[in-house]
C-alpha cells in the first residue's frame, strides 16, 4: 500500500534493480515513463502496457514467460479500471481483476516467482488514508504479505503490515533510495 506515488516509483525501481529479470505490468505507465527517460537503473525488465484489446494476449505472454523471471510487479491495481469504458459493469471488472491477479499468483507459486501487486491509498476518511473499495477487498483479504511504503525523513521506509515470518510493524529503511541515486549509479557503471 502506498500513499505517495513517488515512494511507490522509488520502491518498485529499487526492486527492479535488485532482481535479475523482472516482469513489470505497468497499468499507470509512470514506471515506463521514467524507464524510457533513462532515470531508472534496472537489470533486465520486461515492461507490459496492457490495454482492453490486448489484455488476454498480454496475460498469456506474461504467464508463459514467468518461469524465466525472478519477480513480477503488477502496478497499480487502481489503474486497472482505467483500461475499460466507464459504462463497463464494476462487478465484471472486479471479477476480471481478481482472476488476473490469481492467475499471476498461482503461476508465481508454481515457478517460485513472487508477485507484487501495488495499490495506492486513494482518499481520506476521518483523518486516515483508505484504499478504494475494490482494491481493498481484493488485496486485503487475499494477500499473503501486506506492506506499506512511505517516506521516513528523506529515506524510503517499508513497514510490514502482515507477513507469516516477520513481525507486523517492523520497519526497513532504505537510505538514499530516490531516483537521483539510481540515475547517478547508472551513469557511474
Task: Please name every model-derived segment.
Residues 42-45, 64-68, 93, 165-168, ...:
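Short, low-complexity, polar/charged sequence segments that are solvent-exposed and flexible
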Amino acid at each position: 500500500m502506498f500513499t505517495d506515488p513517488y515512494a511507490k516509483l522509488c520502491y518498485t525501481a529499487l526492486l527492479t534493480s535488485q532482481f535479475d529479470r523482472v516482469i513489470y505490468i505497468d497499468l499507470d505507465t509512470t514506471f515506463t515513463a521514467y524507464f524510457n527517460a533513462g532515470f531508472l537503473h534496472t537489470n533486465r525488465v520486461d515492461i507490459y502496457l496492457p490495454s482492453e484489446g490486448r489484455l488476454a494476449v498480454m496475460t498469456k505472454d506474461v504467464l508463459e514467460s514467468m518461469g524465466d523471471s525472478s519477480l513480477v510487479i503488477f502496478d497499480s491495481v487502481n489503474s486497472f479500471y482505467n483500461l475499460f469504458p466507464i459504462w463497463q459493469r464494476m462487478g465484471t471488472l472486479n471479477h476480471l481483476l481478481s482472476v488476473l491477479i490469481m492467475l499471476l499468483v498461482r503461476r508465481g507459486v508454481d515457478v517460485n516467482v513472487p508477485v507484487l501487486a501495488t495499490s495506492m491509498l486513494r482518499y481520506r476518511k476521518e483523518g486516515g488514508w483508505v484504499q478504494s473499495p475494490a482494491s481493498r477487498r481484493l488485496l486485503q483479504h487475499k494477500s499473503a504479505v501486506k506492506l506499506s511504503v512511505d517516506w521516513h525523513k528523506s529515506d524510503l521506509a517499508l513497514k510490514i503490515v502482515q507477513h507469516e515470518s516477520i513481525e507486523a510493524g517492523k520497519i526497513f529503511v532504505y537510505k538514499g533510495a530516490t531516483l537521483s541515486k539510481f540515475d547517478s549509479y547508472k551513469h557511474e557503471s
